[in-house]
Design a protein with these regions (language model features):
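Active-site acidic short loop of glycosyltransferases
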Residues: 6-8, 19-21, 83-89, 110-111
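Conserved HGGG/HGGXW glycine-rich cap/lid loop of the alpha/beta-hydrolase fold
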Residues: 7-63
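Conserved alpha/beta-hydrolase "nucleophile elbow" surrounding the catalytic nucleophile
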Residues: 28-30, 90, 94-96
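Residue in the alpha/beta-hydrolase core beta-strand immediately N-terminal to the catalytic nucleophile
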Residues: 55, 91, 114-117
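Conserved donor sugar-nucleotide recognition element shared by glycan-biosynthetic enzymes
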Residues: 70-78, 127, 143
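Conserved acidic catalytic loop of the alpha/beta-hydrolase fold
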Residues: 72-90
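Flexible "cap/lid" loop of the alpha/beta hydrolase fold
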Residues: 100-108, 112-145
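Conserved alpha/beta-hydrolase catalytic His-Asp/Glu region
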Residues: 126-129, 140-199
C-alpha cells in the first residue's frame, strides 16, 4: 500500500499483480475502503488482471478535507492517480458511489477508460430528503447513527446470519469513515445529476 499527492490531497492506494492492458481500477462505495474488494482480488489475479484499488477522498487512509466535494472532483482524483502512476488507461469498475465516479470518468476522462463496469449505481438521486436525513444523523451522532441501517441495506438477513465475520469487518469499515468525508461525499451524491451528460 502507498500514498501519492493527487489533486491537492494524499490518496491511499494499492496495486496487486502486473499493470497491463488487463488492469482494472476499482472505486469503492460510500463509507467503505479499498478493502471492500478483498474477496475479488485472488480470483482476478488468477485470470491475469492487474488491480488498482484506492480509498476515495474522505475515506479510509486518504485525506478527508473539508467539503464541498463533487462527483466531478472524485473522478478527477481517479484520473490524477492514473497520471502519477503513469498509467494511460484502465478498465474502471465502481460500486454505488464508485459507479457514479465511473460514469463521470466516462464523461470527463473518456480516454483513460477502456471499459466501464457500473454496479448498483445511478445517474441521478431523486431522494434528496433521504440524503439530507443521513447527513444530519451523522453530523449529530457520528457514523454510529447510520451503521446499523447501512448494514441492513447492504446485506440481506440471510447473509448477515451466514457471514458474521464479514459483517463485522464491514461494520468497522463504516464506523471508521471520517464524518467529514461521509458528509461531503453524501452532499456530492445528493447534488449529482448526469442524466444530461451521459449518452443515451
Amino acid at each position: 500500500m502507498a500514498k501519492h499527492a493527487v489533486n491537492g490531497i494524499d490518496i491511499h492506494y494499492q496495486i496487486d499483480g502486473d499493470i497491463s492492458d488487463k488492469t482494472i481500477m476499482f472505486s469503492n462505495s460510500l463509507a467503505s475502503t479499498l478493502n471492500m474488494w478483498d474477496l475479488q482480488i485472488e480470483h482476478l489475479l488468477a485470470q491475469g488482471f492487474g488491480i488498482i484499488r484506492y480509498d476515495s477522498r474522505g475515506h479510509g487512509q486518504s485525506e478527508a478535507p473539508k467539503g464541498p466535494y463533487s462527483i466531478e472532483m472524485l473522478a478527477d482524483d481517479a484520473a490524477a492517480l492514473l497520471d502519477v502512476l503513469d498509467i494511460e488507461s484502465v478498465h474502471f469498475c465502481g460500486l454505488s458511489k464508485g459507479g457514479m465516479v465511473a460514469q463521470m470518468m466516462g464523461v470527463r476522462h473518456a480516454d483513460r477508460v477502456k471499459s466501464l463496469i457500473i454496479a448498483d449505481s445511478a445517474a441521478f438521486m431523486p431522494s434528496k430528503d433521504t440524503w439530507e436525513q443521513r447527513i444530519q444523523a451523522v453530523t449529530g451522532g457520528g457514523m454510529e447513527a447510520v451503521v446499523d441501517a447501512t448494514i441492513e441495506r447492504w446485506i440481506t438477513s440471510s447473509g448477515r446470519d451466514r457471514l458474521p465475520g464479514q459483517v463485522e469487518l464491514i461494520r468497522q469499515m463504516i464506523l471508521n469513515t471520517p464524518v467529514q468525508g461521509f458528509v461531503a461525499c453524501s452532499e456530492a451524491i445528493k447534488a449529482m445529476d448526469m442524466r444530461i451528460t451521459n449518452p443515451k
